[in-house]
Amino acid sequence: MYKPTPSRATRRGAILGTLALSGAAILPIKACADHPGRISRSLYGPDTLPEPSADMFFAPPWRVLSSNLVPDHDFGPFPNPGNPFSVRARRRSFIVPSDPVAASAPMPIGFSEFGVMLNGIPLDPAGPHWRGDRRSGWQFEVMSPKARPHLGLDDSNAHVHPDGVYHYHGPPSGLLRSLGVADAPPKSMVLLGFAADGFPIYWRWGHLVADDPASPLVELHSGYVLRSGTRDGGPGGRHDGTFVEDYVYDGARGRLDPLNGRIGVTPDWPAGIFHYIITDAFPWIPRLFRGQPHTSFSGHRVGPGIDGVPPALRGYRA
């Protein structure tokens, strides 16, 4: 794992800057703590990473988050046996509508990035398909106990694409720790970032009554549950969460809709808005868009964890 030097320890108790969301505007926000350059050893030798930086600004009708894609928390180590790539810095802009609009029907995220955190690191939850075949109907759930060990995730539930992009597959633990909300309930709802369709993303706490800011904060649980019985064809075996298709949505469970979100008030949108929730169980990161995602959020690059299936999962049978 790569850490800042003790003499310049990470100071990331909260994202620095000001969010001015009441008028659909965001003032400049800085997410660059005083990290020294960090050494990430690649297959080709050592590379020094610059200090992490992320800036958000309002350019009507868009919000733009520009990042150098360097995590602002401890990460790695990379490469590792399940993920043979190194984190690489490059400037990238993520663009979302400042006034998001719901589409006529939810849209599966497919192999697109779902969104971006305020520290400039993308959310990209999709995993490889069984036998590397997208037509198989079975997609590995990267966060599952049987798939995760072979995909090289670090303790922030993240790993690296072949082009060096560090991205989260589950709750961004390093970011949550730096905000002081990884374990203890927060005092108010915590905005973590934005989905590619522009709707905000919050951590797993929300008001008991969605439209009442005076109601207490409670943990918001997903409505997804494991299917009963065994898989029909494909990898066989019981529905144990190894595959995305092992889950089904049950509207009687939890407080969230199939998009892992709900409409309600938040500290940043006191009049209410649809917002996604990152939960601590499936789907962790939502898998459906409410609105139209912007094209600045890319699809997967083939490599371990995508449909370059890691060797240990290539012939998987339950």
Please report, for each region that a protein language model flagged, where it lies by residue.
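N-terminal secretory signal peptides
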Residues: 1-9, 20-23
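Solvent-exposed N-terminal domain segments of exported/luminal and surface proteins
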Residues: 34-147
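A short, polar beta-strand/turn micro-motif
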Residues: 65-111, 170-210, 288-292, 301, ...
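Extracellular-facing segments of soluble proteins and assemblies that are Gly/Ser/Thr-biased and enriched
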Residues: 109-189, 193-195, 199
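Extended, compositionally biased non-globular segments
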Residues: 197-199, 204, 208-304
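Terminal regions of secretory-pathway proteins
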Residues: 306-318
